[in-house]
Amino acid sequence: MKVLSVSSEVFPLIKTGGLADVAGALPGALNPHGIETKTLIPGYPAVMKVIRNPVARLEFADLLGEKATVFEVEHSGMSFLVLDAPAYYNRTGGPYVDATGKDYPDNWQRFAALSLAGAEIAAGQMPGWQPDLVHVHDWQSALVPVYMRYAPTPELPSVLTIHNIAFQGQFGPSIFPGLRLPAHAYSMQGIEYYGDIGFLKGGLQTAHALTTVSPSYAGEILTPEFGMGLEGVIASRAASLHGIVNGIDDGIWNPETDPMIARTYGASTLKDRAINRKQVVEHFGLDDDDGPIFCVVSRLTWQKGMDLLASISSEIVAMGGKLAILGAGDAALEGALFAAAGRHRGRVGVSAGYNEAMSHLMQAGCDAIIIPSRFEPCGLTQLYGLRYGCVPIVARTGGLNDTIIDANHAALQAKVATGIQFSPVTAEGLLQAIRRAIYLFQDRKVWTQMQKQGMKSDVSWGKSAERYAALYSRLVSRGA
């Protein structure tokens, strides 16, 4: 089977979050199932700089008003189709925002162009390769099934994965002519959304199957609390909705082979984590004592619960804990966390921005990772924590609920606990969870058992890839 995947970011070419990890790892996990995937991605400067020996496969003289070329290239064992459209993607900022952190005003056009290019490839316009199915990710490529639905060519089966329904790609109605869709596409059954244009909403209406990244989140987005205004649309497609938990790429996230950490180790050599811990201590300027180091690797936003963490930093320090924080996001939250580091030198350290190598080192050297998200479709950092023996402390929501076994009395007695869950998602709830963690950490036998149990957990893509392969097969055999 041949699959066209369309994503606005893919690791290792370009990454701003977990979407890139998933889009980068799933194709390889599907290979053993006889599924050949080519991934269409925008030609951002960071992408164009690293690709080698690109082969031009498709030319667009007028892709929503601009010239573009699709290049095929092999990189890191994956097959990519890179949409080189300098007018859209050759920007000095990031994939979605400029150097000042503001959304590009033409994001609608940039990602509609990506979607239209995907629909053209799906329609057989790229010589020598015809996909059997299209898999798109989030709002940035959600118009692919919309363009296919309204095209004169036969429609391919399509899958839309919702990684985070909070990001919907909503724009004013004035952009509609620029999308070059027929007039009747601007309707409740199409992309119209309360008078505006909804990219994700259009994809939800037209994709043949919908997936999201955990079973719990699939249920949550059917409710007003988590559906972000789209719960009605999703409820109307509930029979086509599947919750499939993400996995991690064991070739990249493996403490036994990881080149980004100071000392590799396994479940039988946990003492070697001390070398990594020492480097974390040095990087963040922390006191080198026996107290637990709690780490955070996250966007610093309200959704991620970073305001809760900032509000209890003094209490964590008073209990003997230390904090190592890596991330960027809301300026006020960044300021609050840096202020905490200033008040508690040697106990709280903050490193602004995102650093892939440092994120690996923190998982390999810290004792626990804190993930207090108010909602979390799946989450990957808790899976990395399991794999690296960095015990997850998580809010009981979404994929965090599906992937972590809470250290309650029964789970500890049965030796199956892998982390600590808390609810409600409040500052007091988080503080109680950290208090439990510090209590358990004092019994090194219990803590080590939790680490080893987490490291034994199957967090690979194996089972999830089987579910995707089965879904693809059903759709292709049924036809669009």
UniProtKB/Swiss-Prot annotation:
Free-text function comment from the UniProt entry: Synthesizes alpha-1,4-glucan chains using ADP-glucose.
Residues reported in the UniProt entry to bind ADP-alpha-D-glucose: K15
GO BP term (any one) = glycogen biosynthetic process
Please report which protein family the annotation says this sequence is part of.
Answer: Belongs to the glycosyltransferase 1 family. Bacterial/plant glycogen synthase subfamily.
Q: Which organism is it from?
A: Rhizobium rhizogenes (strain K84 / ATCC BAA-868)
Name listed for the protein in its UniProt record: Glycogen synthase
- Establish whether keyword Transferase is in the entry: yes
Which NCBIfam families does the UniProt record give?
Answer: glgA, PRK00654.1-2
